[in-house]
């Protein structure tokens, strides 16, 4: 695997994805983030799960060689955060090792083969929701939620309706 990406974009999706990884598990692979580089689509995809929730995030990348590894969910975002503000290279030079380079900085992290990761089955794209407008939707409706002291729990909620026309 050999990938060239922007540090800020990679840090954003690595931090987001790491939130789904459990702190403890019986399988070492579940504690990590599955990192997959696809040269055909020029995409880098990160996936993490705790068997209840799954976070999968993708970004455009310059992929010279496809491949996948599982990397520690605690170490991967921390290593990226400490890199200088420039392009980042991710490379599996040797089996069981991911090298992260940026400028003069270099990290070598232990990695598992991507085949070891228990990849969750995700629903078809028709059954998923884009979350791009969810933040603004919440921001525009939360003013109507009752303050503390109102005895009725439904008055402290926001109703979201998902239908064929989208999210309302």
Give the ranges of each region predicted by the language model.
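Structural preference for solvent-exposed beta-strand-turn elements
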Residues: 1-168
């Amino acid at each position: 695997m050999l990938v060239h990406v922007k540090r800020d974009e990679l840090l954003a999706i690595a931090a987001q994805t790491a939130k789904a990884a459990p702190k403890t598990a019986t399988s070492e692979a579940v504690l990590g983030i599955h990192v997959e580089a696809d040269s055909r689509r020029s995409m880098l995809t990160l996936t993490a799960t705790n068997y209840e929730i799954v976070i999968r995030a993708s970004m455009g990348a310059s992929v010279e060689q496809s491949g996948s590894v599982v990397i520690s969910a605690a170490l991967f975002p921390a290593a990226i955060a400490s890199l200088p503000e420039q392009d980042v290279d991710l490379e599996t030079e040797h089996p069981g090792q991911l090298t992260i380079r940026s400028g003069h900085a270099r990290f070598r992290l232990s990695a598992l083969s991507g085949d070891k990761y228990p990849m969750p089955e995700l629903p078809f794209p028709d059954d998923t929701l884009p979350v791009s407008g969810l933040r603004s939707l919440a921001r525009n409706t939360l003013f109507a939620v009752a303050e503390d002291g109102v005895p009725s729990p439904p008055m402290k909620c926001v109703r979201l309706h998902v239908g064929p026309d989208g999210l309302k």
